[in-house]
């Protein structure tokens, strides 16, 4: 094993990125601006990131020979999505470091582990029950009541892998509809709005957070993000401090997106994503340093940049041919005073 470890990457070093979609594309562009090369590993042909990266390997995540060659060709590996097979990580980790860490991935890939982790830190989530059988589903419904939401523990995103339960829902049919997988039932949260915080942590433990953004979703997909969010000063402080605590507890390196519900002035954590986040695209036009550069800085061992916001922002997300396009519009430029 020839594990490559380096606190600070030198100019011209290569950063490997798992996933070649839009986020991988933006990470590659940020890396290039900082003087780094990128190597994309992606199963699909001609992904967006391949157009701006130094190298591109098209292969499945179970193609261990190509994974090993990929990992041996780079100085560090990061990723644009969290549902990476464990076997792929095993191969890569023998060759070089992976940031963010596997612990962060492991927790974020499993909704049950994620909620237990958050609760252990002393923070609030929706009430929940583990569901591994039809009998456990019936018990969970009796305990949490309806409305409630039944979700797969793994591989769910953008509203996929979940179903809302009402008073007339049939547990037997619901159990069959989700494929009898490992599930989690979450109690209903009566919230006024949703927010997210994009935070980052460097190799030397420096933590920085962008201002919280207020998000609007439709059918489980992000539509708009508005900054500043509708929060009290204390809520804003709490959201940032909670994000910082999660980063510190995971010994995290890179950018993270933490999503919250605001319910009766209380912050309830929905989930976190161990990667650059769709609700953080506004930072490209609204901040001195955006989330993509911040992530590359962190995984490369550089100091974090200035995350200060220089204008109010409304980000509208449109979808064309199933690909997201963000238009970030400053809603008010700061005064010259």
Where are these regions (language model features)?
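ATP-binding N-terminal substructure of ATP-dependent carboxylate-amine bond-forming enzymes
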Residues: 1-116, 135
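A short linear hydrophobic-aromatic micro-motif
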Residues: 127, 147-149, 182-186, 256-257, ...
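Protein kinase-like catalytic core scaffold
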Residues: 208, 267-271
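Active-site "cap" helix and flanking loop/linker of ATP-utilizing ligase/carboxylase catalytic domains
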Residues: 237-258, 263, 273-319
């Amino acid at each position: 094993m020839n594990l490559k470890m380096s606190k600070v990457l030198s100019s011209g070093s290569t950063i490997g990125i798992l996933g070649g979609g839009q986020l991988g594309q933006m990470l590659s562009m940020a890396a290039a601006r900082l003087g780094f090369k990128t190597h994309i590993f992606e199963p699909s042909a001609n992904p967006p990131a391949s157009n701006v990266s130094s190298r591109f390997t098209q292969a499945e995540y179970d193609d261990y020979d190509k994974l090993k060659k990929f990992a041996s060709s780079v100085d560090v590996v990061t990723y644009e999505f969290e549902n990476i097979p464990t076997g792929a990580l095993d191969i890569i980790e023998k060759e070089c470091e992976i940031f963010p860490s596997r612990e962060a991935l492991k927790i974020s890939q499993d909704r049950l582990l994620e909620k237990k982790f958050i609760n252990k830190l002393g923070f609030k989530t929706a009430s929940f029950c583990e569901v591994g059988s039809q009998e456990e589903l019936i018990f969970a419904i009796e305990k949490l009541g309806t409305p409630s939401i039944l979700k797969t523990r793994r591989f769910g995103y953008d509203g996929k892998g979940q179903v809302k339960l009402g008073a007339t829902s049939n547990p037997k049919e619901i159990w069959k509809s989700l494929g009898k997988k490992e599930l989690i039932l979450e109690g209903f949260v009566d919230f006024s709005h949703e927010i997210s915080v994009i935070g980052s942590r460097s190799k030397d433990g420096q933590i920085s957070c962008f201002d919280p953004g207020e998000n609007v979703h439709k059918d489980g997909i992000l539509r708009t993000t508005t900054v500043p969010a509708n929060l009290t000063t204390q809520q804003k402080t709490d959201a940032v401090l909670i994000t910082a605590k999660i980063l510190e507890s995971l010994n995290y390196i890179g950018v993270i997106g933490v999503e919250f519900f605001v319910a009766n002035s209380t912050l309830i954590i929905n989930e976190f994503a161990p990667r650059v986040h769709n609700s953080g695209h506004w930072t490209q036009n609204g901040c001195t340093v955006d989330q993509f550069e911040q992530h590359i800085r962190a995984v490369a061992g550089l100091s974090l940049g200035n995350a200060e916001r220089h204008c109010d922002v409304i980000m509208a997300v449109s979808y064309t041919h199933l690909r997201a396009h963000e238009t970030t519009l400053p809603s008010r430029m700061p005064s010259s005073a």
